[in-house]
Amino acid sequence: MVRKSHADETGQRAPDMPYVFFPIARHRLTSGRAAALLVFGLALGTARAEVGELVLGVAPLLSETETRAQFQPLCDYLAAVARLPCRVGTRPNFITYWETVRQGKDFNLILDEAHFTDYRAQKMKFTVLAKIPNTVTYSLIIPRAAKLSDPARLAGRRIATLGIPSMGAAQLNGLFTKPSKQPILLEVDNAAAGFALLRDDKVAAAILPTPLVREEIMRGAPFRVLLSTAPLPHMGFSSAPDIGPELRQRLRQALLDAHKSDAGRAMLARIGLERFDPANATVYAGQGRILKEYWGY
């Protein structure tokens, strides 16, 4: 288990239901017709009362402000499909996000990393609808000028990572398996904070999602990649059990067909994706085991 410190220890090196209304008839209804209308009304009311709004939860890889700005176009697109309001929800860091995940109340749609997607599918009966295409890795990065080629030499030194139980923290644990040769995990709230610590020489390295690392380096950041982890299924989009089958299928199809419509393509461009791919729980099966292996969840 990687030893842990906190981002403020900078000098230490150590280790909602709608009613359905019918106009009052001017003539008497037969009992059969009245019953039919009643059944229809109840069914419609039930269908519409599954959820009062969509709340799209997103893992806190970015800051709360950045996450809401980045994914509101996706929320707006789904709101139009569902004819329900939609808002983006996230948390300031992974430890508070994890508490929200385990309670299972705040988000009824979620775009999340592989291990959390599997956890929800297995433990909370969420349904996987789609995923971001391809796979994703994490990259261990160091300053460009650092004369370091062996990750083992980072033992005893500070490495910035997204907080426990993020995938980044799990990947860092997997890199350093010897109890006597551990780095010091320095938890950060989001990727930008990790980049800042590395740029200011407050950590020797950082392990962060490779797509974000690539963007940062392309913007001129003085970093280089020491290694990248084995690929994982990219982030999955899943729905909570209170999203009924009909709405769930509409949302799934809207995601998978987004690249075929003007509105969908505009949304994808704004969130930086080409498309969503089909996915189900099998894609993520077994990924949640790291939550138990490393942290006992």
Which residue ranges define each predicted feature?
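Hydrophobic residues within well-ordered alpha-helices
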Residues: T100-Q103, L154, L197-R199, L251
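Extracytoplasmic small-molecule ligand-binding "clamshell" domains
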Residues: E50-F116
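Bacterial N-terminal signal peptides
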Residues: A34-A43
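Acidic, polar ligand-binding/catalytic clefts
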Residues: R91, T96-R153
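A ligand-binding cleft/hinge motif common to bilobed small-molecule-binding domains
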Residues: L111-K123, R199-F223, P231
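Periplasmic-binding protein-like
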Residues: G52-L61, T67, N134-I142, M218-H259, ...
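Bilobed "Venus flytrap"/periplasmic-binding protein-like clamshell domains
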Residues: V51, L56, L61-Y77, T137-A196, ...
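Short helix-initiation/N-cap motifs at beta->coil->alpha
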Residues: V88-T100, I184-A196, P231-P233
